[in-house]
Amino acid sequence: MRFKSFDIVPHGTKFDFVGKRHIAVVLSLIVNAAVLLWAVPAIHGLNFGVDFAGGTEMEVKFAQPVDAGAIRKSVEDLGFKGASVQTYGDEEEHAFLIRVERIALMGEEDVKRVVDAVQAKFPVERWSFNPEIGDKIDFEFKQPPSPQALQAAVEGAGVGVREVRAEQGLAAGTRSFAVITQGIREKIERDLSTHFAQAQPEVRRVEYVGPAVGRELRNQGFKAVLYAMALIVVYVGLRFDFRFSPGVIIAILHDAIVTLGYFAFTGREFNLTSIAVLLTVVGYSVNDTVVVYDRIRENQAKYKGKSLAEIVNLSINETLGRTFLTSFATALSLVGLLVYGVGTLFDFSAAMLVGIVSGTYSTWFIAAPMTIWFEERAAKKKASTPAAAAPSAPGRAAQK
């Protein structure tokens, strides 16, 4: 008994992928150049999240449903422009992640105002402020004031104080005080409690990422993508031939840049999850490419008389159904996440969808066709070597 199958991609297709490679390469160059230009900070830049830019992330739970837009407006009205508010966890929990790009309320002007106010009342030996910490000013006195008097002086400068902590002075005969100012958590928590009193907001978790740590995370993330690409090139070279590696590295670079374009052009937040997307796209892209390369290797042994261009075109057509259906099935699951996903999950799904489309395209038009281009260049270079030596032949003949 034979079963009838429904083929989305019919057998025996004869699309000329190799013949269209020049158009595809020009199109890819334009798209990649546009993404890279738009991602330059001086032109537009990526919207780095708290993970990479540094800042404060708060998880807040409400007892009743609250609109994310209303929370965002409330936070931005406090002076935190560009605040990100996303739903977190199950919808029934009414939990949100609030991200702001600052780890402290105090800037340079605030610190100067506080120091001037304290110095106007007490003889300060020295003071220090670490912007990486952002909410603590250290004062050292020979004749220390009482903690209450110091707190009153700081609050008189318009800065709320959470704690004044006495510490041992650095020099003999001195006394230090660490003034801990009210931070972002207290300000946002107080504001939410005022505007959403009936919803009973509860701060579950607060995380701070300093700018230096954010830069380090960002650099390490991009390094991880580059290391993954390098290992993939080595794998392809060992499994097939290192002649195939340039095509692979160009294809996965193409896919990573196109996926990056989703974050660059939409302005969506680029964070550690985005790095995970790039790594996933790179791995997914090379999977399709390996399928085509396997078929090329088989067909090279099978069709000795055919040129590499003919074998590549034949191999892509023979694996067309498999590569298309694999990508199509994955895309269907991502569409479901796009419909029901929010926040980070939505961005992950959307960027993955862009990467899968790009990966399928690069498998057909970039990876294998670029291998042909490198082979043709190598053949021309090899052919030009005897030609360069040809003028010496007549001289040898004359000597005979």
Predicted regions and their residues:
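A structural signal for conserved, well-ordered secondary-structure elements
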Residues: 1-400
